[in-house]
């Protein structure tokens, strides 16, 4: 706000989800706040410009060990494939999905709050340290998960939501192996129970929410 030279204003924020869920709330909040402040000054920012500014605040100014995906997802929206380049550029390409695929996702994606909330910074910092230290296993894991992302894009654009669910399961297994703090026995039990009762795949979202992809069959 100081860099924006905004006149004295009062800001009040309300949220339906608790802090520490890891659902990208900090990136979304920063992006939305910047958009509101620039809008107050009657200045329009392009989506990419807004996302980069939000990244600057969180990563450069606040020193948070986060990536750019949350800010870009908040600024651009929709189902989008993001490519993060070595030179710090970000390319955003909207997925080409049929209406049937969108309806299928709406019907079968369920988000459960596990009751756990924490800061994801510790896990992300550990991951960032290993990556920058050229940890072979971590780099191999990240490259494989990147390929899973491209496979998920192809599955969705071809309308194969079952394959998407299976890829989500594979993604979770690899993500969980990065750190002992990524999951816990209780969450693992809930995940296994869901898989035994019709879920095709799922993953823990950030630090608290559990996203499960269920089969199209009727569920209780």
What are these regions (language model features)?
Residues 1-53, 187-190, 195:
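Anion-binding (especially nucleotide phosphate/pyrophosphate-binding) glycine-rich loop
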Residues 2, 39, 47, 52-65, ...:
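C-terminal nucleotide
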Residues 211-213:
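Structural motif
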């Amino acid at each position: 706000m100081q860099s924006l030279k905004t006149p004295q204003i009062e800001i009040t924020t309300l949220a339906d989800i608790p802090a520490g869920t890891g659902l990208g709330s900090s990136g979304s909040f920063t992006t939305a706040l910047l958009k509101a402040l620039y809008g107050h000054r009657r200045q329009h920012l392009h989506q990419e410009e807004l996302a980069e500014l939000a990244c600057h605040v969180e990563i450069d100014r606040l020193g948070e060990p986060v990536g750019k995906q949350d800010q870009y997802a908040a600024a651009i929206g929709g189902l989008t494939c993001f490519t993060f380049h070595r030179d710090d550029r970000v390319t955003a390409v909207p997925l080409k999905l049929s209406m049937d695929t969108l309806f299928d996702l709406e019907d079968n994606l369920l988000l459960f709050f596990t009751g756990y909330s924490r800061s994801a910074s510790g896990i992300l910092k550990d991951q960032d340290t290993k990556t920058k230290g050229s940890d072979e296993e971590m780099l191999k894991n990240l490259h494989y998960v990147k390929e899973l992302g491209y496979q998920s894009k192809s599955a969705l654009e071809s309308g194969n939501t079952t394959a998407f669910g299976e890829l989500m399961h594979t993604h979770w297994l690899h993500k969980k192996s990065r750190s002992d703090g990524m999951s816990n026995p209780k969450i693992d039990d809930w995940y296994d129970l869901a898989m035994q009762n019709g879920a095709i795949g799922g993953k823990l979202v950030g630090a608290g929410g559990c996203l499960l992809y269920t089969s199209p069959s009727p569920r209780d």
